[in-house]
């Protein structure tokens, strides 16, 4: 992956830290069912957490033999809506505090949420950057097909905040439900460029060119995680949250492009 607007030293540090392409970028599906007789937890998590949480889940299972971790990855607002409409899960991890607050206001949290990571936005362009995109303002050029997230989801809210702060308003050809949907449209050539989180751009390192822009630094999404009141495995749910926020989880989050809260 080529990075524009990012120092060579930082790119090298990211590569040394183990940032490699993620094998799958398909839309999230419902969690797989647990193995018969096994204890399991269901984790509803923002789509941007897919790579990091899959790795954390493997470590969690290794430390808890016989336990399954079943993930549902999707846009945070979609997951929050499912929870408030009666869906059952053990843990919720949101890409912003607003969606966590909506679940808290519905009385669905077993305790207080914990802020565990932050993320910022980056432009992803088709591999090689054939449209020569260099800045956020370039996304307004005539004839450029740009995709973003819907304003109702955290990545779309972040995009809107950047627009408001800069006075530069985009005219996207589509608004997607999650960052993975935005990435897929750029990777498959359905769009020339899109706005996603840094962590998601790193997960498709060989398939896109990333363009850093200074305006993104002023808009930071804070990720929150909490145990849900409807959990059937409260002890395991708390252990999973503890792993995410402890050193083992922090290492994986760092390697996946997330910053500390």
From Swiss-Prot:
One record GO biological process: molybdate ion transport
Annotated lipid attachment (N-palmitoyl cysteine): 22
InterPro entries: ModA, ModA/WtpA
Gene3D superfamilies reported for this sequence: Periplasmic binding protein-like II
Pfam families according to UniProt: SBP_bac_11 (PF13531)
Annotated compartments: Cell membrane
Topological relation to the membrane, as annotated: Lipid-anchor
Keyword Transport on entry: yes
Keyword tags: Cell membrane, Lipoprotein, Membrane, Metal-binding, Molybdenum, Palmitate, Signal, Transport, Tungsten
A single cellular component GO annotation: plasma membrane
Coarse class of the protein's main subcellular location: membrane
Misc note: Was identified as a high-confidence drug target.
Family: Belongs to the bacterial solute-binding protein ModA family.
Annotated protein name in UniProt: Molybdate-binding protein ModA
Encoding gene per record: modA
């Amino acid at each position: 992956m080529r990075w524009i607007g990012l120092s060579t030293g930082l790119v090298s540090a990211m590569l040394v830290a183990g940032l490699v392409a993620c094998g799958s970028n398909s839309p999230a599906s419902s969690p797989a069912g647990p193995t018969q007789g096994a204890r399991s937890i269901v984790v509803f998590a923002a789509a941007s957490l897919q790579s990091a949480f899959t790795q954390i889940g493997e470590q969690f299972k290794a430390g808890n033999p016989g336990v399954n971790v079943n993930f549902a990855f999707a846009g945070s607002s979609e997951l929050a809506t499912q929870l408030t409409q009666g869906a059952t899960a053990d843990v919720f991890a949101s890409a912003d505090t607003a969606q966590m607050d909506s679940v808290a206001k519905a009385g669905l949290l077993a305790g207080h949420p914990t802020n565990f990571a932050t993320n910022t936005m980056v432009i992803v362009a088709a591999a090689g950057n054939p449209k020569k995109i260099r800045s956020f303002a370039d996304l307004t050029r005539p004839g450029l097909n740009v995709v973003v997230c819907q304003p109702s989801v955290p990545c779309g809210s972040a995009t809107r905040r950047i627009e408001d702060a800069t006075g530069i308003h985009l005219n996207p050809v589509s608004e997607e439900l999650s960052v993975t949907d935005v990435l897929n449209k750029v990777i498959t050539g359905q769009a020339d460029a899109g706005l996603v989180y840094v962590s998601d751009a790193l997960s498709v390192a060989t398939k896109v060119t990333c363009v850093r822009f200074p305006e993104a630094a002023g808009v930071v999404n804070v990720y929150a995680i909490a145990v849900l009141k409807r959990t059937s495995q409260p002890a395991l749910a708390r252990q999973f949250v503890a792993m995410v926020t402890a050193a083992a989880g922090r290492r994986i989050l760092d390697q996946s492009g997330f910053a500390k809260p």
